[in-house]
Amino acid sequence: MGQKINPTGFRVGVIRDWDAKWYADKDFAAFLHEDIEIRNFINKKLQDASVSRIEIERAAKRVNISIHTAKPGMVIGKGGSEVENLRKQLNKLTGRQVHINIVEIKKPDLDAKLVGENIARQLEQRIAFRRAMRQAMQRTMRAGAKGIKTQASGRLNGADIARREHYNEGLVPLHTLRADIDYAWEEAATTYGRIGIKTWINRGEILPEKPKQNSVKGGK
């Protein structure tokens, strides 16, 4: 099962938390569609800002959005002008008060989405897919990853018949729930058609906290 299921969803509730943190009864469908609109709007608006993850929290009529990015300066802008403009646009989109928090990704080479985006952009620039994948894997391993696996699917190098190729280095234990596996899927729009890029990165293990032992032992 660990080989088939999405590694991110497989670990939610174990070592990962939800990207959407809110509760709704009758308004669940409306909030879900609003979340999708928010994510699509931010990803389109900040497509060059290396945005990896968007967390959404709701409290009454307020929406708190945390944007994880490797380029916080590009998102914030000069004097905070860009992020303020983004906040106003999201206020108009949702009809609610929006608060935006920018979270910097200090090691982008350990983020599966950013690594996949980098490979996809190189393929769009007609760089050989094997070279792009292997260079990305080397940078990730140098950044401190325990393992990485990449896969490209489609008309690779313009071949008439679509195929898939994958490369891996180190350990990527997909079925080990305590393993911090980051997974992402990206697309490269090439002249030969679309090529899918999948990336798995093992960032080590997250061990559960041990229960505290009682300081007072048995007595009378």
UniProtKB/Swiss-Prot annotation:
Top-rank taxon: Bacteria
GO CC, alphabetical: cytosolic small ribosomal subunit
InterPro entries: KH_dom (IPR004087), KH_dom-like_a/b (IPR015946), KH_dom_type_2 (IPR004044), KH_sf_prok-type (IPR009019), Ribosomal_S3_C_sf (IPR036419), Ribosomal_uS3_bac-typ (IPR005704), Ribosomal_uS3_C (IPR001351), Ribosomal_uS3_CS (IPR018280)
Ranges for domain KH type-2: 38-106
SMART domains registered for this protein in UniProt: KH (SM00322)
Pfam family, one: Ribosomal_S3_C
Alphabetical keyword list: Ribonucleoprotein, Ribosomal protein, RNA-binding, rRNA-binding
Any single GO BP term: translation
Quaternary structure annotation from Swiss-Prot or TrEMBL: Part of the 30S ribosomal subunit. Forms a tight complex with proteins S10 and S14.
PANTHER family named among the record's database cross-references: 30S/40S RIBOSOMAL PROTEIN S3, SMALL RIBOSOMAL SUBUNIT PROTEIN US3C
Protein family membership: Belongs to the universal ribosomal protein uS3 family.
Job description of the protein: Binds the lower part of the 30S subunit head. Binds mRNA in the 70S ribosome, positioning it for translation.
Name assigned to this protein: Small ribosomal subunit protein uS3
Organism, scientific name: Lacticaseibacillus paracasei (strain ATCC 334 / BCRC 17002 / CCUG 31169 / CIP 107868 / KCTC 3260 / NRRL B-441) (Lactobacillus paracasei)
